[in-house]
Every structure is written in structure tokens, then in C-alpha cells.
Curated annotation (Swiss-Prot):
Modification sites for Phosphothreonine: 426
Basic and acidic residues bias (residue ranges): 655-665
Gene Ontology CC annotations of this record: cytoplasm; nucleolus; nucleoplasm; nucleus
Gene3D superfamilies linked to this entry: Vaccinia Virus protein VP39
Location in or out of the cell: Nucleus, Nucleolus
Originating species: Saccharomyces cerevisiae (strain ATCC 204508 / S288c) (Baker's yeast)
Residues annotated as the enzyme's active site: 310
Chain's gene name: NCL1
Sequence similarity: Belongs to the class I-like SAM-binding methyltransferase superfamily. RsmB/NOP family. TRM4 subfamily.
Segments of skewed composition (Low complexity): 666-684
Swiss-Prot/TrEMBL GO biological process terms: cellular response to hydrogen peroxide; tRNA methylation; tRNA modification; tRNA wobble base cytosine methylation
Gene Ontology MF annotations: tRNA (cytidine-5-)-methyltransferase activity; tRNA binding
UniProt protein name: Multisite-specific tRNA:(cytosine-C(5))-methyltransferase
Function: Methylates cytosine to m5C at several positions in different tRNAs and pre-tRNAs containing intron. Able to modify tRNAs at all four positions (34, 40, 48 and 49) at which m5C has been found in tRNAs. May be involved in ribosome biogenesis as its disruption leads to increased sensitivity to the antibiotic paromomycin.
Length: 684
């Protein structure tokens, strides 16, 4: 008799929840007023005066919850329809305690209708059953990477960057990773095996590891996470031991979402109200400029760079952009994006702004404590710079946070000419390390010790003729189109002992040529995981690599299954073949599966609907039983999306329902491999 899957809720987190109970408790108590902030932004006159009260009132209101559906997943349309058909009707015309609740709305400017906004108080989500069901849906889909919670305005920079599958992409200040996830999605648009890759960098070691946690959900072999100060991001060699200046990686696309004062986030970061002052923007200006200039150095000819902040302060925005244009001259230009993102209400960049010190005393160029780059460009410069091509998004325009976005295009790759123009206000950007100016980000990095596992385990590529790999190639019928030179391990011996990873071919070259200069935190997806040694092949294919490997395997370990069989495997653990046969669920499946030798195998499930993708999932086949190798989160998601079963609402099975399986040991065990038997599912 099979065991029922354990649907215990455990320590399930709510969608987007964080341990900030005190902050939530004090939300209503905090005075959302700041006299200096109000005086400063009124003086700037960034929008018509009659909009001020609406702007301020919006800034004082909580930020709506927004989420987007992962566009690179083939079942994105299915997840969207699931939300629109099963949830949206129940969230429309809802009343709570005598008050009509706003229905979810689509973000009109986000491509393919994949982003939505819920402007609903948390008390409603907690107490209203329909909204609670939707929250459970969001929790499950978020856990498996089908959706991401992300502030609406934060979604803009990756879209206007226009990443294609063949691009090399650098995210200079990537944590916590929501924008990086968009870049990866764009890279994988319409292909499981893009030729490009994304390098995600953050200056803080701990935030780099948080970044890995966020991005692992996407299962991309085309991602590398590194830990460097963005101001001094190192040159990446294309080939090892090369001193040729032309043998340096230049990126097609670069995202510069720089550290900023964050005064556009005061709807969610309420402490901005009490902490805000002009000094924050003034103090970060040089750092922001250094990062932007470094990014422009790393940008390929005809490449595109997006500079963005979650600040509304011109000192952090147009002033930085203007100084870069001043330094680089006609080697770069600003891209007009007026025809992009139709439906997004935005304002143009400004060309004039005053400069104030901490006490709101206006300063002039040359005053002590100021940089010339703080100040507005001359009329002649302004006519050339086209700062109106910058984009400003104000909270009251579409019920969002505040944001600033600028798109640069590199017209001519002339690093030396631009370097000569750089003033002493910025460090020598072509240097390989921080030799001049010390900054706060660097100080934080020094204080925070790198986690013990960071960079202690090297990336060692394995000879494709290694005996362990040869067994895998033969057992699974891996074709020669798959690049077998991309397999690596993370141990000093270089021997495949527990896990073998794979990276895309382009990243393999980068890793090998830069092991002495890149602080690599993470790269690759698990390909093979070691299991029992007493079977024909002791390695199973980890399902996070299935989107790649399904294109390169022969059909000798693949068995077709019907939907009823899938449902049975999702609900029951280790069902016995005789039990499946007696229930007449899928006799053809049982007949074919029992003929296979023990070990890893795969099921191909047809949905019988051209609008819905088929499923390709891993199983462990024993002598007498079988087990579906997907994690709890994927199990819940598949049950709900395909069969309408809300597993999160199930009660925990009683002890009487659980029966010991004789062949439980036939399934790979966590104690023998050091890695969970459960892994994300893949689809074809």
C-alpha cells in the first residue's frame, strides 16, 4: 500500500512575508511627515503645484501588493488563466466590514498581461476567505518560481534594457534579485538553451547569498553570481593568461540599479519619513557616478545600459547622468523611450535643479563641500544632453512607488578617450581594485565576514571521459550535441563524489579564465546527483537541469503516463506497481516502467490540450514501487494547477494512514547523498 504524501503546512511563510512585526505594529503610529522633505521637493517643482497634495497623500499610503508571472515559463499563460478564472471573479465586488474592496487590476504597461496589482489591506487578506485562497495560490506559485512579488516600478528597468537570448548581461548591484530574475527570464525567452548569460553582482557578501536564494528558483545554467564592489568591478578575461586588452569581456547589456537614498520607497520603508535629509543624496552621488562610469567602461559598442534609482532626487539622478554625458561626450547617448511601455504614465527628466545642504541652505558651484557635478548643466550642455529622455515615475501617477530610469547607448567604444576626461572626483575606473576612494559599501563588506562556504570550494571542470560521467552518458543516452565539457564539481579534488553541475558553454570559458580574479558565489545547475551504488547507474539527473537535458536524452528511460497516473503519483508516495495495476490507472505505463532497470527514469505526461504544455518529470523506479521526484512545493503547485486540488488546505494525514514501505530504501535517501530527494519539476 502506498503512503499518502505529507501535506503538512509546517512553517509555511506568507507571500512576501518578513519578520517585521514591530514595524507593522507601529505603521499607524509613525508620523508620516517630514518638513525638510516637503520643503525640498516643493522647491524642486518636479510636477505641477496642484498635484502636490495628491502626491503627498499617495506617499503616505501603504504600497499595493504587485506580482508578475514568469514570462519565460511555457506555462505562463496557463498560470495567468488560472488566476483570472479561479481567483479574479471571487475578488471582484467584495465587501468587507461594510466597505467595498478594490478588485485586482492588471498593470497596463507590463508585456503580455503578466503583472497584477492588489491594493488590499492586510486585514482583509487575513480575514476574507477568498483573498486568503488567493494568497495561498501566490505562495505556492512563488515558491516554484512561476511568479515573483516585485514592486511595480522596479519591473521597468529590465524591460527597457531589452535583453535577448544571445546577450551577455551584467547586473552591477543585483541584490535582492527581482530585477535580475527578469533579466534571466528575458534571456530564456523562447529557448531553454540561450547562448548568452547573466552575471549578477553585489558588493555585500551576505546579500550575494540572498541573491542566490532568489534566483535558484529559475534553474538557469546561464547565471553566475559574484561578490565585488561595483565601482571597481574587475575586467573579465575571455581566455586565461592573456594580457591582450582586447581579450576582455564587454557586455551587451548592463543594469546599473545603484545604491540610493530610497526616498521613492517611503510607502513601504516608513523610516524614510523620519530619517530623510538632503545629505543622503549628496553623499551617494559620487558612488553612483563611479558605478555608472565603470558600467560604461564595461559596455560593448552599440550596447545598452540602464541607470536607475528608487529616488526622486535630481542629485542622484539627472546630475549623475549629466556628468557621465559630460565625461563621455558623443561616445554615449540617451535613448528616447517614449514609445516603450504604452500605458505607463511617466514624466520627463529635468534639466534644472537647486543644490541644498543638510540645513536646506542653497549652495552654488565652488562652495565648500560641493562637487561641480551636483549642479545643473549649462543651457548649451542641456541642449546636447537631452535629459528629457530620462524617465521619472511619481507615486501618485499610477499608485506606485517613485522611480528614475535612464537608458544609455554606447555609440563608440573609446575607453581611453573617456578615461582621459575623468576628473579627480572619480577613481581610476580601469584599476582592478579600490585604490583611491573608500565608500560605505566597501566598509560594510569588510565588516561582514564572508560565509564559510563562499569561495572556499573551487569550480573544477571534469573530464567528460571520466568513468562516472561515461556511465551517465550511456545510461541516459545523452547525445553528442550536449556540450559534455561544461560539467563541474565544487570540491578541491575535482572528483565527482556527490553532485555534478553544468553551466552554459560561454560561462565555462569565463570561469576557467578568471578563477584568480572573480569572487564567484554561485553558478550552474545540478546535473547529476549520486545515489545508490548497487544499481546500473548510481547517478540520477536532477530535475532542475531537465529543461536542458530533455532535449538531449534518448527515450530509453522515458515512459508516457496519463493524467490519472500523474495525479496518483502526486498524492501517493512510493505506490506499489501491483497496487497501481489493481486500480487500473494506467496499465500500459506499469507494463513499460516495470521493464526498466532500477534507478532514475522520467514520465512524459500529455495534457491532451494544445494550449497546455505537456509535463516531463523525474521518478525513481524501484523493483516493486515508484516515486515521483518533485519537492513539496512543486507537488502542491501541480495538484492545484492541473487538478484543482488545494493541498495547502489539506489536513495532515493521521499516523494510521501511513504504512511502512518495504522498498522505501530503493528511493534515493537524503542521508546517503547529502541533498534532498525532492527537486523542482521541469516541463516540456
Amino acid at each position: 500500500m502506498a503512503r499518502r504524501k505529507n501535506f503538512k503546512k509546517g512553517n509555511k511563510k506568507t507571500f512576501g512575508a518578513r519578520d517585521d512585526s514591530r514595524a507593522q505594529k507601529n505603521w499607524s503610529e509613525l508620523v508620516k511627515e517630514n518638513e525638510k522633505w516637503e520643503k525640498y521637493y516643493k522647491t524642486l517643482a518636479l510636477f505641477p503645484e496642484d498635484q502636490w497634495e495628491e502626491f503627498k497623500k499617495t506617499c503616505q499610503a501603504p504600497l499595493p501588493l504587485t506580482f508578475r508571472i514568469t514570462g519565460s515559463r511555457k506555462h505562463a499563460g496557463e498560470v495567468l488563466n488560472l488566476f483570472k478564472e479561479r481567483h479574479l471573479p471571487n475578488l471582484t465586488n467584495v465587501e468587507f466590514e461594510g466597505e467595498k474592496i478594490k478588485a485586482p487590476v492588471e498593470l497596463p504597461w507590463y508585456p503580455d498581461h503578466l503583472a497584477w496589482q492588489l491594493d488590499v489591506p492586510k486585514t482583509v487578506i487575513r480575514k476574507n476567505e477568498q483573498f486568503a485562497k488567493t494568497q495561498r495560490f501566490l505562495v505556492v506559485e512563488n515558491a516554484v518560481g512561476n511568479i515573483s512579488r516585485q514592486e511595480a516600478v522596479s519591473m521597468i528597468p529590465p524591460i527597457v534594457l531589452e535583453v535577448k537570448p544571445h546577450h551577455t548581461v551584467l547586473d552591477m548591484c543585483a541584490a535582492p534579485g527581482s530585477k535580475t530574475a527578469q533579466l534571466i527570464e528575458a534571456l530564456h525567452k523562447d529557448t531553454d538553451e540561450p547562448s548568452g548569460f547573466v552575471v549578477a553582482n553585489d558588493a555585500d557578501a551576505r546579500r550575494s547569498h540572498m541573491l542566490v536564494h532568489q534566483l535558484k528558483r529559475l534553474n538557469s545554467a546561464n547565471l553566475m553570481v559574484v561578490n565585488h564592489d561595483a565601482q571597481f568591478f574587475p575586467r573579465i578575461r575571455l581566455h586565461g593568461n592573456s594580457n591582450n586588452k582586447n581579450d576582455v569581456l564587454k557586455f551587451d547589456r548592463i543594469l546599473c540599479d545603484v545604491p540610493c537614498s530610497g526616498d521613492g520607497t517611503m510607502r513601504k520603508n516608513v523610516n524614510v519619513w523620519k530619517d530623510w535629509n538632503t545629505q543622503a543624496g549628496l553623499g551617494l552621488h559620487a558612488v553612483q557616478l563611479n558605478i555608472l562610469n565603470r558600467g560604461l567602461h564595461l559596455l560593448k559598442n552599440n550596447g545598452r545600459l540602464v541607470y536607475s534609482t528608487c529616488s526622486l532626487n535630481p542629485i542622484e539622478n539627472e546630475a549623475v547622468v549629466a556628468e557621465a554625458l559630460r565625461k563621455w561626450g558623443d561616445k554615449i547617448r540617451l535613448v528616447n523611450c517614449d514609445d516603450k511601455l504604452p500605458g505607463l504614465i511617466r514624466s520627463k527628466g529635468v534639466s534644472k535643479w537647486p543644490v541644498y545642504d543638510r540645513n536646506l541652505t542653497e549652495k552654488t558651484k565652488g562652495d565648500e563641500g560641493t562637487l561641480d557635478s551636483f549642479f545643473s548643466p549649462s543651457e548649451e550642455e542641456a541642449s546636447k544632453f537631452n535629459l528629457q529622455n530620462c524617465m521619472r515615475v511619481y507615486p501618485h501617477q499610477q499608485n506606485t512607488g517613485g522611480f528614475f530610469i535612464t537608458v544609455f547607448e554606447k555609440v563608440e567604444d573609446s575607453t581611453e578617450a573617456a578615461t582621459e576626461k575623468l576628473s579627480s572626483e572619480t577613481p581610476a575606473l580601469e584599476s582592478e581594485g579600490p585604490q583611491t576612494k573608500k565608500i560605505k559599501v566597501e566598509e560594510v563588506q569588510k565588516k561582514e565576514r564572508l560565509p564559510r562556504d563562499a569561495n572556499e570550494e573551487p569550480f573544477v571542470f571534469v573530464d567528460p571521459q571520466h568513468e562516472a560521467l561515461k556511465v551517465c552518458w550511456d545510461f541516459y543516452g545523452i547525445d553528442n550535441i550536449f556540450d559534455r565539457n561544461t560539467c563541474l564539481v565544487r570540491n578541491a579534488t575535482g572528483e565527482p563524489t556527490r553532485v555534478v553541475y553544468t553551466v552554459c558553454p560561454a560561462l565555462k570559458d569565463v570561469i576557467q579564465a578568471n578563477d584568480d580574479r572573480l569572487k564567484i558565489i554561485y553558478s550552474g545547475v545540478k546535473l547529476f546527483v549520486s545515489q545508490r551504488s548497487d544499481i546500473e547507474c548510481s547517478w540520477r539527473i536532477q530535475s532542475e537541469s531537465l529543461p536542458i537535458m530533455k532535449h538531449h536524452m534518448k527515450s530509453n528511460r522515458i515512459v508516457e503516463a496519463n493524467l490519472e497516473m500523474l495525479k496518483h503519483l502526486l498524492i501517493e508516495s512510493f505506490p506499489n506497481f501491483d497496487d497501481i495495476r489493481s486500480k487500473n490507472i494506467d496499465n500500459d505505463f506499469v507494463e513499460k516502467m516495470t521493464k526498466l532497470s532500477s534507478g532514475c527514469a522520467f514520465i512524459d505526461v500529455s495534457r491532451n490540450d494544445p494550449a497546455k504544455e505537456n509535463l516531463f518529470l523525474p521518478v525513481w523506479k524501484g523493483n516493486k514501487c515508484i516515486n515521483l521526484m518533485v519537492c513539496k512545493e512543486d507537488t502542491h503547485e501541480l495538484l492545484y494547477r492541473i487538478f484543482g486540488i488545494d493541498a495547502n488546505a489539506k489536513a495532515t494525514p493521521s499516523a494510521e494512514e501511513k504504512e511502512k514501505e518495504k522498498e522505501t530504501t530503493e528511493s534515493p535517501a537524503e542521508t546517503t547523498t547529502g541533498t534532498s530527494t525532492e527537486a523542482p519539476s521541469a516541463a516540456n
